[in-house]
Amino acid sequence: MAVGLCKAMSQGLVTFRDVALDFSQEEWEWLKPSQKDLYRDVMLENYRNLVWLGLSISKPNMISLLEQGKEPWMVERKMSQGHCADWESWCEIEELSPKWFIDEDEISQEMVMERLASHGLECSSFREAWKYKGEFELHQGNAERHFMQVTAVKEISTGKRDNEFSNSGRSIPLKSVFLTQQKVPTIQQVHKFDIYDKLFPQNSVIIEYKRLHAEKESLIGNECEEFNQSTYLSKDIGIPPGEKPYESHDFSKLLSFHSLFTQHQTTHFGKLPHGYDECGDAFSCYSFFTQPQRIHSGEKPYACNDCGKAFSHDFFLSEHQRTHIGEKPYECKECNKAFRQSAHLAQHQRIHTGEKPFACNECGKAFSRYAFLVEHQRIHTGEKPYECKECNKAFRQSAHLNQHQRIHTGEKPYECNQCGKAFSRRIALTLHQRIHTGEKPFKCSECGKTFGYRSHLNQHQRIHTGEKPYECIKCGKFFRTDSQLNRHHRIHTGERPFECSKCGKAFSDALVLIHHKRSHAGEKPYECNKCGKAFSCGSYLNQHQRIHTGEKPYECSECGKAFHQILSLRLHQRIHAGEKPYKCNECGNNFSCVSALRRHQRIHNRETL
């Protein structure tokens, strides 16, 4: 069997056509935008996998058009001999000649069966497939038997259910019928995804196929173990109820990548000549063996001339080289943003559509990319697979580990081109640059105030909601932000960590120290545009400007009196509370504010004089 498989591969039996699905222009219009994106992603990924396995010699026209962002139906083939001069080179299968294609309006069951028998492809149980109203399902046989796959390409513009048999004459009005002969494992073996995961561990095609298969089983139970393409197709394409325009499409090609899996599955029917000691996989043909072997050997023969980075295949090198030349051929029609790879464009377009097809089965949170879902699920599992070798701290994402390691190396690769300040994270640079641009993209829906950081907006909104989630464990006082709580703690501890280098005066808050330093320099950068008075900090200017505007936003809840400054309100509230924290050392009198105490102390000073 292994010899026969290698012979089949050498004759071109395993090609891109085995893992591709064509749509006519009319059929393409039935697809939703998200399904078109999925189609593009899967077709390009299938081609990459073929390249990786060494099974693709020349790039198909379909791939070229998909890479250019064009519609795939532009490469719709006319399957009759008269409409395709280069038919034999397209199908790439020497055993199949154009006489296999029957370009007639109607063809009877007997005629098709007669042609099958004439080519030695008679299957006694194949006739049973004709009983199911043209739903040409994958027909199960054992691994040693021939398997007939029927793909019908038909016109849908008439709105007729062309693939149904009429009761009289049992005729099949098909545009054309293409019959290919393959050897495949049983359906039970096809469902052993763990085998395929060894060969394609990160393949999104497998992931999507598993999902669809699970959904199908939940709908139909275990009554039938054969694949029902029409079930998948009707669900995924959004066909109106009662119509079955594509019943005979082999839609599983799009998601199962079955031809390559069939080749790998052959390892379970006998000893094969090429095997790996590293992973236990065996391959029936040398081209299967040599390409995956590069994973274990680390061989990367294709090196970039610009940066020296190496790749296992020239296809991946070509994609990488776009980073140097700046080529971004895939452009978003919504915002004109361009990308180097079509897969990146498809992911980006979900921002505009809002599509989040990957949902967490633990909490229901949905994501636009499968990779984001995998990272999120580690929150539930507690898995942190990325560990720092320096301090053994573990992380859920490799990107977080890379960022953390810069603490140890001191690397700050992101530099501001305005002031030269460098940062260890790109997001930190992006946020910093808003200081120079004045950009404040986060707006409060209550008062319209804008902020440069989302965290600042969140803190501000607590003014409107009254939320104060941070509590002092010493006195029970609550604060809106953790920084306010930290500053408050220093009242209890007496800590003043911020010291002026000029006069030695210490402060509990860094901002107060900054304002203090301006008193030494005489710097007053904040000037009132009404009277020209200047101030050392912006908050002083804001308070001053209320004199001109008459604004008094701070109102006493006891008597209704309003004030320009919040400090004035606090001093006033001590009158209602009877609080007098400032005591005269001479006579023992108490006062509600320090200015009242100072006025009082002048009396004692005059008495001594």
UniProtKB/Swiss-Prot annotation:
Residues 14-123 form the KRAB domain. Keywords: DNA-binding, Metal-binding, Nucleus, Repeat, Transcription, Transcription regulation, Zinc, Zinc-finger. It comes from the Eukaryota. Its main location: nucleus. SUPFAM superfamilies: beta-beta-alpha zinc fingers (SSF57667), KRAB domain (Kruppel-associated box) (SSF109640). GO terms for biological process: regulation of transcription by RNA polymerase II. A zinc finger (C2H2-type) spans 274-296, 302-324, 330-352, 358-380, 386-408, 414-436, 442-464, 470-492, 498-520, 526-548, 554-576, 582-604. GO terms for cellular component: nucleus. GO terms for molecular function: DNA-binding transcription factor activity, RNA polymerase II-specific; RNA polymerase II cis-regulatory region sequence-specific DNA binding; zinc ion binding. It is found in: Nucleus. May be involved in transcriptional regulation. Belongs to the krueppel C2H2-type zinc-finger protein family. PANTHER family: ZINC FINGER AND SCAN DOMAIN-CONTAINING, ZINC FINGER PROTEIN 983. This is Zinc finger protein 527. It comes from Homo sapiens.
